Each structure stands twice: as C-alpha cells, then as structure tokens.
Amino acid sequence: MPNLASWFRILTSCRWNIAIPIALIPLLIGCPSRPQPTRNSTSHTDQEDALAAVRDTVRKEHKADTFKTAVAQLNVYLGRPTDAKPAIASPSERDLLANKLHLSADELKEVLREDFSPLDVHYLDECFLFHDAARGLKLDFAQKSDAAQLERGRLCFAWAMRQVWLNDKPSRPLPPSYALRMGFGNLAERTGVALAILQVIGIDAGVVGIAKDRTTLEPWCLAMRIGNEIYLLDPRGGKPVPGEGGKGIATLRQVRKNPALAQAYVQANVSNNDVASTVANSKVWLSPPLSSLSPRMRWLQSVLPVNPPVALGADVLSDIDEFAKAGETIDFWNPEGDITSMTRRLSHFVRQSDGGFEPNPPGQRLIDSYLSSLVPFAQMPALLRGNVVTGDPANRLRGIFSQRFLKFQLEVDQPRDQVLRGHFDDANRALVELLSEIKTVQRHIAGETDLDQGALKWAEDWRHAASQVERLKRDKRSEQEIHEATSRVAALEKAADKMMLVIERSASEPFAGMITFQLALCKHEQAERVARTRRDEADVIRDAWQNSAGWWRNYLGRFGTAGWIQPGQINHAKKLLAEVESEIAKLPAAKSNP
C-alpha cells in the first residue's frame, strides 16, 4: 500500500502527527520582553549597527517570527542611550486618544509605552502582508501627483474587492489580515481589508456614515482623502462610486451638492431612506488600528527605508487638519468597549497572554470560529462525524481532513499567501502540482473495492481495542495485559489505510475546488498586471485574459453547484469572469495569421 503522505505533501509527513492549526501559530508565539536598559555609553556606530540589524531582519521573509525578532532588536536599540527615539505623545494627542477614541486605561498604556510590545508583532505582521500585496500590484510610486495617488488608491481598492468576496453574515468582524487570508467576509470585514491596504500605502481613509446612536454607526461608503478631495468607494458592490454623469469617481463634495449620486448606497446601507437628510448629516469617521496610534510606529516607519514606503503610524492630529482642508470635520468611531471597531479589531483578537485584549475564554474566542469557517466539516466522512471513532485518534483523523484546508489558506509560502503577495509563478506551480496530486489520489481510490466496509471494520476494531485498554486500566489488570492491548491499538493506528482513503475521498473535491478558485484568481491577477504594464501588446494582454477566463469557466463548470461552496463565492467568480470578458471585448481584433 503506497504511503498517502507521498501523494499529498500538504499533509504532515506522519499521518498521525497533527500539528497545531496554522492560524494559531502567530498567537501562540511568545514575544520577548524588553531587555533591561544598559548603562554603558554607546557610540553612534553601535546605534546605527543596531538599527541596521532591524532593517536587515525586516527585509527577510515576512512572517510572525521575523517581526518577533525585529521587536526584540528594536528594544535592544531603545535600551541604549540614544537621541533617536520615538517622540512622546503631546497632551493634546493624549486628550484625543482618551476622549475622542475612548481608549481604556490599558489601551492607553499600550499605545503610550516607549518600547515595542508583543502586540506590535501582530500589527507589523499584518502591515507587511498588505505592504507586500501593494508591492505585488506593481504600482507607480514615483509619481507624487494627486492623480497618481488616486490611481494607486483605486487599484488597491479593486485588489481588495477581488481578494475578499462578500459573505454578509452577521458576526463579529475579523482583523483585516485574517479576513484577507480567509478570502471572504461580511461588509465590515471587506471594508476593513480595503482600509488596511490604503493605510499602508499612505492614503488617509475611513468611512462616510451616520451615527444612529452612541454605539451604532451606519456607514454607506468608504472615503479616501486625496489632496483636498474625498473620494467615495462602495465596498458592498466592490466598485468606486461614479461621479457626475458617470464620469470618474464621485467626491464627497459632489455628493453633498447632489445627494442623488449616493442614493443607491444610502438605501442599501442605512435604515433611514431619506437620502438628502442622511447625506447632509453624515460624517467622515476614522478608526485607526490601536497599534498605529502609538508614536513608536510613526518613528519606526521613519527609520525603515523600505520600497515602496510603508505607513505604520497614524497621526490623528494631522488627520483632523488635512480633512479640514478638504472641507470636512472628521470624527473618530471607537465607542467605549466596542471590540468590533477597526481600532480594536486586531488588538482584541490577539489573546491576552500574547499582549492582546481578547476578552473570551478558549473555545469562545474569535479564532475558534475563524478556523472552523475554513474547513468544510459537512464533507467530513460520517465515521468521523459520529461516535464510531472517538477520543484522540478521532481528533487526529479529523485533523488530517482539516489541516490541508487550514495550511493552504493560512500559512506563509502556501499558495493563498503567494497569490496575496504577488508571487504568481510560485503559486501557479504549487497549485497545478496540488491538482495533479489530487487526481493521483482519486485514481487510486477509484480502484479500491469495499472501501467503506473496510473503513467501518477498522473503526469498529479500533473502538473495541481502545475500549479494552480502558477496561483493563479501570480493572487494574496486569501491566502485561495492558501493554498487549495498547500494542493492538497502536497496530490498528498504523493500519488505517482504508480510513485514510475514505478521508481523502471526502476531502479531495472541496480541496480541488479551493485550489481551482485560487488558480483562477492567480491568473486573473497576472492578467491585470500584464494589462497595465504592457499596454501596447494587445495580443499578450488578450492571451493573459483568455487564460484567466478559461480557469474561471473551469471553476464554475465543475464546482458551480457544489453544496459545500461558501455563500457568495460563485457570484464572485461570475463577476470576475464578467470583468475578464469585458476586458477582452475592449481589445482590438486579434491579428490574423498570414
């Protein structure tokens, strides 16, 4: 019997050795505490060497371990005598944090601390995921005009909408990086992903909406400030709001003068359908992430010469002035204790032992429902959903079923991560190889006889053997008898081939669907880059778009009616296919061969 692990490298090398779920790894990593400051004098060269070490670390692979190391190095640097340190928050800034952003005493302590914290590891990990995504978009950062910045904002918003389809379920919203890796989310999550990528490229953004009361905000558009104008984007529909006459992107100034431009967006998102009144009374609301409010983040972005530049810190006092130049008096949305606001979304997702403020106990934390949403448990073999196999072996077998989905979607350098960071060649190779491996497994399964009966017999034999071990222990029988019974259980666990094949049969189709969707999305992203960077090569652009269209049709034709598909995913695929077909239709006719 061939070893299944040789067919499926996505699984662990040992079938019974199930690792900690990948999404938990960043939360389980302990961050180093700040070293005790040294009292020795430090030369300017030593100071520069310490900062150079931080820069070298951040240039490496962007994952939690990288930023754990960087935080430790930063705290070593800050522990030495040096003038190049983060500024201290001014009294007016402290007042705004306490009275406008309604930070608790513990949150203020986190924001105002002078050294870098365990929570900063998670924040930097999130920021650099979005920074890598922006770099993968191949944007032109050399142009500094408002028009160029508007185009960068439009392209980043479009990318966020492609990567996260709308599954508008009522639930506590995830932090942006987690919603992004998941690939779908409710309206608040989709909005959060767009805000996060706009933030890291240096565009001030928030939402336009009306506060029903002190704890309920009804946003109807996303707003990004470019120069002295505020442009409106629709995260529900995934498109910019059209301006007057359908031209360009509508500005808030235009909508204030002509509320009819916002009618569809107000009616879709606000309980009060009096459009004119809603537009007149709406504000621009900002909700910067908690960690971004710290002066140390503004300092850090000034000493990290990355390309393109990365915006890590929010200057809320400056934001007030800049939006005022655009004619708007902004406000901040972060009601006291509201863990769903963008300000608290990441900080209250991270558990307290890792520097966060997650209020719920294990089993009730947001991470638990997050992991569950990524695995099609309804497709799991009935033997594992019932009580035929129980205890630790059942958990291991369920892990073998679920681990591939978690690893594929969440782990650094797995295909989803590669697509997000713009590593398309690596993603293509990995995705095609995975589809080939699934076909190999499916061909082997097709040649099996009595697979279900064999798996059931194994499960019943294992249950009997495990029960015997428990009975012998309970009756305090001899060590020899217990050892022999335990050996029988171990032998059965090594001979679980039929059960393993049943698991593979159940997992292969939903996993193939996940892979095919990412492959179509990867081809779509590649075609989008080709269309922007090789504008004079119509045939090359056409080939890229047609390749993408072929994969979208492949996905929809094979999985379009599958019951395990997440709500909204098929509609999203259809929309992206329609976009591709529209792009192809705009191209000049293909040159005929002589």
Indicate where each model-derived feature is located.
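Hydrophobic/aromatic-rich core segments of domains that either
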Residues: 126-144, 152-162, 167-171, 177-178, ...
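Residues that mark the junctions of alpha-helical repeat units in TPR/alpha-solenoid scaffolds
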Residues: 407, 461, 505-507, 512-514, ...
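Helix-turn-helix repeat elements of alpha-solenoid scaffolds
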Residues: 431, 484-498, 542-549
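Bacterial signal peptide processing site
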Residues: 31-34
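Specific register positions within alpha-helical solenoid repeats of the TPR/Sel1-like families, i.e.
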Residues: 419, 436, 443, 463, ...
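"A position-specific structural signal for the A-helix of alpha-solenoid helical repeats
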Residues: 511, 518, 522-525, 569-579, ...
